[in-house]
Structure formats: structure tokens, C-alpha cells
């Protein structure tokens, strides 16, 4: 270890070795100031604040995203969502894709798509929507950080404020909306209390807890998609039947639902005929 005495001090305070190393790497201990910052960061982590917020940035696929409590911490499952979306776009054979990222949060999904498409020589344009001005500020910051300019940010509740001229012209709608029901949220890890509640918890529908936002997105997406356009959407592990039924009822074809790496139902894929 770079500084075994400090690592030992942090572990004794209650951090695990991995977190101690991360914090030391991030804040350093070269002088009195950085040492004080390191100890403050350790206190925040020991108080229960997620490491991603304490450090202030976190890797997501090929990006290093700035993160703070204004936005949700992107999950590993959401990295898989990006992979599925890329595969769908490749299958759609679109030369200059128009992508809409609903509820963009930190910008993770849409910006990762732009970056990885650019690596493949594909020039895409992105519209990133979120109803939270705070989230949009973080997403803008992340776009600037990574030099991703083919993106417009719009404050919008789902499709509400999307430019009407895009109706029927979008190649990919991608979304990681709130999908946790209030009852389930109450039973989850209290550390989630640090994250923005509105990005996690959704209203229940008559049949399915936490399904209200997904229902709205699936129902409204078809009209915005171009013929052959794809909807790729993350959802909760108890919502497979609900998302499949909603997508078929909305008029989608090639409707499928994929498991995540842990084997849970997680990603809806559907195509506009």
C-alpha cells in the first residue's frame, strides 16, 4: 500500500481496505490540507454516505461521470442497458441515429451511447430529458467533461416538452425510469436515502407496484419512434409480465425482455413496426 499507516488508520476507523485505498488514491495525503480532506471524506463514508458521492465521480462503461446527491448513482445493470441499446441500434441499421434518453439523471446512459457510437464511427444526436434542473446541470457537466456536444438537454416530464417535430423520427428511446414501489422502497437499504427519491420511486398502478412511469413511457414511445425504431427500457425484477403486456398493447412488435447479469428480469426491448 502507498501509505500503510494511513490505510491502517482508516481501516481501524471502520472502512474496509478497498474503500480506504480508494479514498487515499482520490484525496492523497501529501500535505495537511489533503490529509484533512481525506479524513473528512472518511467521516462522510462512515456516516453512511455512498462512496460514489464522497469521491464525487465514478466509472460508467467508458466514461468517468461526475456524481453528487442531485443524481442517482448509476448501477451495473444500467451499464448492461447501454450494451443492449447499442446492439439494438446496430440491428436497426440506421446511419445517423436520433436518440432520446428519458429521465437522463447524470447523463450516464445517453452520454455512454454517444461516446461508444463515436468510437465506432457513428455520429448520433441525443436529446436528454429530465424533469429535475439539478440532474440536467450534472448531465451537462458530464457532457462537457467528455467533449460530447451532439446533445440537447431539455427539462421535461417524459415526452412532455420534447420538440414535436421529432414525432415519428426517433430511432432509439432509452430509459431507466423510477420503478421501485413505495412499499418495496421502505424495505430497502437505508443508504438509498442519500439518493434523489424521485429517481427511484414510482407510483403503483392497479396491478403492479412502481409501474406508473414505465406504463406512461411504454404507452407514449411508439408515436415518437420512427418505423423500425427501438424502445429499450430498464425495469424492476417483478415487472416482466407488466412490461411485456404494456409493450404489446401499445402496438410494439419483436417485444422481448432480457435478464441482467444476476439473472433477474431487467431490460425490455421492443420495436415500432
Would you name each region that the model predicts?
Residues 23, 48, 78, 109, ...:
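Residue-level signal for inorganic ion chemistry
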Residues 64, 125, 150-152, 253-256:
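Conserved beta-strand segments of alpha/beta enzyme cores
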Residues 113, 191, 217-221:
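Class I S-adenosylmethionine-dependent transferase superfamily signal
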Residues 178-213:
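Mobile active-site "lid"/loop adjacent to the S-adenosyl-L-methionine
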Residues 208-270:
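Conserved Class I SAM-dependent methyltransferase catalytic core
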Amino acid at each position: 500500500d502507498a501509505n500503510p499507516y494511513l490505510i491502517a488508520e482508516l481501516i481501524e476507523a471502520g472502512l474496509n481496505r478497498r474503500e480506504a485505498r480508494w479514498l487515499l488514491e482520490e484525496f492523497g495525503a501529501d500535505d495537511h490540507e489533503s490529509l484533512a480532506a481525506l479524513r473528512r471524506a472518511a467521516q462522510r463514508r462512515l456516516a453512511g454516505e455512498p462512496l460514489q458521492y464522497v469521491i464525487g465521480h465514478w466509472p460508467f462503461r467508458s466514461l468517468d461521470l461526475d456524481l453528487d446527491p442531485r443524481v442517482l448513482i448509476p448501477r451495473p445493470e444500467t451499464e448492461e442497458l447501454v450494451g443492449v441499446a447499442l446492439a439494438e441500434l446496430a440491428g436497426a441499421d440506421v446511419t445517423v441515429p436520433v436518440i432520446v434518453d428519458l429521465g437522463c439523471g447524470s447523463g450516464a446512459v445517453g452520454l455512454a451511447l454517444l461516446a461508444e457510437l463515436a468510437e465506432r464511427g457513428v455520429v448520433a444526436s441525443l436529446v436528454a430529458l429530465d424533469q429535475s434542473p439539478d440532474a440536467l446541470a450534472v448531465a451537462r457537466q458530464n457532457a462537457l467533461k467528455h467533449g460530447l456536444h451532439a446533445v440537447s438537454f431539455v427539462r421535461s416530464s417524459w415526452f412532455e416538452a420534447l420538440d414535436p417535430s421529432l414525432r415519428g423520427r426517433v430511432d432509439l428511446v432509452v430509459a431507466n425510469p423510477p420503478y421501485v414501489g413505495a412499499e418495496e422502497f421502505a424495505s430497502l437499504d437505508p443508504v438509498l436515502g442519500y439518493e434523489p427519491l424521485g429517481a427511484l420511486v414510482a407510483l403503483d398502478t392497479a396491478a403492479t407496484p412502481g409501474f406508473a412511469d414505465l406504463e406512461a413511457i411504454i404507452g407514449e414511445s411508439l408515436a415518437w419512434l420512427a418505423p423500425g425504431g427501438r424502445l429499450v427500457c430498464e425495469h424492476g425484477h417483478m415487472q416482466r409480465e407488466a412490461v411485456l403486456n404494456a409493450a404489446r398493447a401499445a402496438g410494439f412488435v419483436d417485444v422481448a425482455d432480457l435478464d441482467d447479469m444476476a439473472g433477474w428480469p431487467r431490460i425490455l426491448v421492443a420495436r415500432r413496426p
